A protein has these predicted regions:
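Oxidoreductase cofactor-interface core, primarily capturing Rossmann-like NAD(P)-dependent enzymes
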Residues: 1-45, 59-62, 69-71, 80-87, ...
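N-terminal glycine-/serine-/threonine-rich beta1-alpha1-beta2 phosphate-ribose binding loop
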Residues: 48-49
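Cofactor-binding loops of NAD(P)H-dependent oxidoreductases
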Residues: 55-56
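Periplasmic-binding protein-like
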Residues: 75-77
Length: 300
């Protein structure tokens, strides 16, 4: 075990996914510090209850040195589809090692060695940097996030259908990122996951499975449909460049041809319980839409 109340730096602490790590660390008596990119994000981080906020840039080694100094552990998830993602990840690993950080939890991606997908392969150099460091690393390789369904939820409710740009019977591995966050917190506050590399999924689900769960929870039929990639992008209004969209299109092309494999064995073992199921996640979304059940946590 680390010392009581270990100091943990959460990089990008106000992001859609990194923020889930903060309450899990706090439940384990960690003192959470945040690295964010501007004053507006700093205010959000403080509202989440962190003890200290650093404003910095993953491309600025001085800010990384300042943020990692005196920390017992670091949680890191890289910015998606960024051209220099690998370099930024290596920089935070090197800063952590130079400053004597003990533990490092990296939220990578399932199947990073699928080098046909450049955004998957961009995690490999970061993993290699950890393997070649003196840090007690834990590498988390999560599947497709269930929270992506949550992002589409307003449209699902409004239009009564859910679309992704691959066939509706194709199964892909999905995971509730809150479970990934819990594993990260365990890794950063205990020793049992030190030097583990873990594929994290709750199981494999098709879009037919997703809409069946939604229909059951809402009590009305929801349709699964297959938009083209361009139609899906236009509907999703993603804040990505043309190059980032190209990388994303390759992921969905892979899903179309091969699906995405994964099982819940590693996640169940790491959590010491069954992971949150697809039905559990859908049920929470449905309750958020019910005015009689306020105050539930949202994905964003």
């Amino acid at each position: 075990m680390l010392l009581n109340q270990p100091k943990i730096l959460v990089v990008g602490a106000t992001g859609k996914f990194a923020r889930w790590v903060i309450p899990e660390l706090m439940r384990r008596d960690a003192v959470v510090h945040a690295l964010v990119r501007n004053d507006a994000r700093a205010a959000v981080a403080r509202s989440l209850g962190v003890a200290e906020v650093f404003i910095g840039d993953l491309r600025n080694t001085d800010s990384l040195a300042e943020a990692t100094r005196g920390m017992d552990g670091v949680f890191y998830i890289g910015p998606a589809f960024t051209p220099d993602e690998a370099a930024m990840g290596i920089a935070i690993v090197e800063a952590a090692e130079r400053n004597g950080v003990k533990k490092f939890a990296f939220s990578s991606v399932i199947q990073p060695t699928n080098t046909r997908l450049k955004n998957h392969a961009s995690k490999i150099p970061v993993e290699e940097a950890l393997y070649s460091s003196r840090l007690e690393y834990t590498i988390l390789q999560p599947a497709n996030f269930m929270q992506n369904i949550g992002i589409a939820w307003p449209s699902i409710i409004l239009h009564g259908r859910f679309g992704e740009p691959f066939p509706k019977d194709i199964k892909i591995a999905r995971v509730d990122y809150r479970d990934v966050a819990e594993v990260a917190a365990i890794a950063l506050t205990e020793d049992k996951l030190a030097f583990a590399t873990l594929e994290l999924a709750a199981g494999m689900f098709s879009r037919n499975d997703v809409v069946a769960a939604i229909s059951a929870e809402l009590g009305r039929p929801i349709e699964a449909f297959e938009p083209s990639f361009s139609e899906w992008v236009q509907s999703a209004r993603l804040p990505y460049s043309e190059q980032q969209m190209h990388l994303l299109s390759k992921i969905h092309e892979h899903y179309r041809n091969y699906g995405l494999g994964g099982n819940s064995l590693s996640l169940t073992a790491a959590l010491g319980r069954e992971p949150r199921s697809l039905r559990d996640y859908i049920r929470e979304l449905a309750r958020q839409n019910d005015p009689s059940t306020p105050h539930l946590a949202k994905d964003s």
